[in-house]
């Protein structure tokens, strides 16, 4: 399954119509998993301890003449002692405008992810058409006052077309539309005690409030597109994809009397190149990715107009008050020793670079980080028994992240707020820490019956992340999963 997905270059892209050019072997799987991590080396909004239990399924098949792929996953994620978030499900999704409080709290989160792809067969004129749909939803609940019930939804549609120029060259085009919405409602279970909270406006700038919080409505859209080029010879496969999309999302206070508070304009450009070569004895895989993401943080000035013609909040002015820019580049190389439809062993290496610079324009504040990551790993696929196709896959890997530069400087008012002293300072310390990771996994698999195609597997993995920077120590991760491929 692992090697099959690596060879399907169009399935890795944003173009569903190109599935016709991939290996069209039918496959499906069902996986149940449990993941646990703890330790003090984490971002301030993450839990000191996090446990996740989930189930996922994926499948690909021919439905008459059409090609169809689909997947579904559900996760129940429990966070313990998470801080500095009292507003949204994911504080790392590129939305700087949310609410924090001074108490660490447990969270109970649920995530649903449903995806499908469909493609026509290759027509006589060399064209194929496809579509991808994605629906994601999450429900999150903070367990300590001020409590939060937040619900996030996104619906994405990606129509696509591809054209076979000749046996070796293919071109593709895909367009993307995505609708985004999140409803956040705060309240105090103990109404006798008011709680302090802070409305974030970027890099530590905040407005303090007291009481039970507020309701916040996040809504927006994302538009974009991608171009693909595929070269397929008898030996080499080369795949190039360039994509660009723009997300515009607004933040409104209150549902009964909406007040436009802030918004973002998020632009992302990505260019990737993938090559795959399968020889008689060895296979090679190389993937390079460059990503640039720029977010403009927009703030609104509004006044309440209770005239008969309006009776609501009127926007007087809006301006870009903060910017968030991230550049990332990575190169991943894999060498495999072939053994029939599987591999005997695999060696992997990766080099990744990232540079982030966030700025609040006036009064000026800045948070930046520049890092480089080295990764090496190896896998050995042992034949435990030829009968029932018994295998034991051993995986060992190690990573090292080196910080090249970084800082956090706050120039605004109220430097004593926890948004400055705790949230942004701790986050900058995490981003600018050196760390190392050592880990491995064992996967045992075998056929359920000698004459059946169903393959059962169980996997256990462990990773240790260590550091001594900024009074951090470690983060340990344990995962156990079981499932079947058929």
Locate each region found by the language model:
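Long, internal scaffold/assembly segments composed of regular secondary structure
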Residues: 205-349
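Outer-membrane beta-barrel "beta-signal"
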Residues: 167, 474-486
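Residues on the lipid-exposed face of transmembrane beta-strands in outer-membrane beta-barrel proteins
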Residues: 55-61, 114-120, 157-163, 225-231, ...
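Outer-membrane beta-barrel translocator domains and adjoining extracellular loop/strand segments
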Residues: 40-46, 81-87, 141-148, 184-190, ...
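Outer-membrane beta-barrel channels and translocator barrels
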Residues: 63-66, 122-125, 164-168, 232-234, ...
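Transmembrane beta-strands of outer-membrane beta-barrel pores
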Residues: 32-38, 74-78, 122, 135-139, ...
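Membrane-embedded beta-strand positions of outer-membrane beta-barrel proteins
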Residues: 28-32, 70-72, 129-133, 159, ...
